[in-house]
Amino acid sequence: MAVKQRIDQQSAWVLHTLPWRETSLIVEVFSRDHGRLALVAKGARRPHSAFRGVLMAFQPLLMDWSGGGEVRTLVRAEWQGGQPLLTGQALLCGYYLNELLVKLTPRDDPHPNLFVAYADAVRELGLGRPPPPVLRQFELALLQELGYGIELVHDVQSGEAVRGDATYAYIIEGGPAALDAPGDAPPDLPVVSGQTLLDMAAGDFSRSETLAQSKRLLRVLINHYLGGQPLQSRRVLQELLEL
């Protein structure tokens, strides 16, 4: 039997909402200390509900909820403010971040560092920062925080440190392996420079080559861990932007 509990004053972000019954919502949230979970907001669609206008994506909230099981009951939600609204390209990028969290994070699995990375990404998008480096930073943080062991600084075959002047094939669920020439890599493995790997490890996406190569590498890795699940937000982004 699920243990019922009351959680108060929990920092959280709304990832997705769905209508439920006639007047309520199922709200998928990402919380600081409890990870991703589903809450039912009873009566949230009624005209005078305290939840109306509060349960918005990309806005920091404080939430109280109660209950056990797969879906808890949302008791209170309070807007914290301070976050610019996402519009245009930034809004599409935000939906992409949310879809990654929904499809890759298990429920009830806390990831406080990932929570901080998400908040940082949303803030940067809201401030009008160029989206590509913001997305790459978050994608990398997501894979690392979920325990996928993204190796960036050691050659997995030789054990030696990655060299900035070398070229590597990236073995999925392994790591970089040095190549004598870029054409030596198997066709299904991404090829990256050592400098790109070192830049990624340092969180530096300022070089154009690093930005381009990290995009390809992270896309391959994310697709692998998605296990064939499509990302609708990515499809829209690909149609509108080169992200």
UniProtKB/Swiss-Prot annotation:
Belongs to the RecO family. The gene is recO. It comes from Azoarcus sp. (strain BH72). Involved in DNA repair and RecF pathway recombination. The keyword DNA repair applies. Keywords: DNA damage, DNA recombination, DNA repair. GO terms for cellular component: bacterial nucleoid. GO terms for biological process: DNA recombination; double-strand break repair. It holds the Pfam family RecO_C. HAMAP family: RecO. This is DNA repair protein RecO.
